[in-house]
């Protein structure tokens, strides 16, 4: 019945990455042949036009391109794609890698994940990536400002 369907949707499955849009969005092909856009759950990377936006994309690209990642759907479709937790073949959490390298903000409105808080704090303390720019603004604020233009 309906419940059974929901369980199937939440199961993780492998995806072959074919392109990377920005620091938290990639396009991949699932085994069934469906090409979908995926958005990494619980982080927000700088937009391409923001400081470090290009670097964030490049970092994600280096982690995932031409590789398979396991994705686990989290809360459905967003305008940016299917929201997923993504793990690499080495079992690294993509969101955690992005936070730890200073290429994403942690969206604490999504999940209370101590590991993510620690990784973001590490990057802040090291002053790396987005944290090298004292005047950086969170992408969700940036999008608001630029939507008006």
Model segments located where?
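Small beta-barrel nucleic-acid-binding modules, primarily SNase/OB-fold domains
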Residues: 1-149
């Amino acid at each position: 019945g309906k419940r059974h369907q929901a369980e199937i949707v939440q199961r993780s499955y492998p995806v072959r990455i074919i392109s990377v849009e920005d620091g938290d969005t990639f396009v991949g092909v699932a085994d069934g042949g469906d090409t979908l856009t995926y958005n990494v759950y619980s982080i927000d990377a700088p937009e391409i036009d923001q400081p470090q936006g290009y670097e964030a994309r490049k970092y994600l690209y280096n982690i995932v391109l031409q590789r398979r990642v396991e994705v686990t759907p989290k809360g459905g479709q967003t305008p940016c794609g299917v929201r997923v937790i993504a793990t690499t073949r080495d079992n690294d959490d993509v969101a955690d890698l992005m936070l730890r390298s200073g290429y994403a903000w942690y969206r604490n409105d999504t999940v209370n994940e101590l590991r993510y808080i620690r990784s973001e704090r590490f990057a802040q303390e090291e002053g790396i990536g987005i944290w090298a720019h004292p005047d950086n603004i969170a992408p969700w604020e940036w999008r608001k400002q630029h939507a008006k233009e």
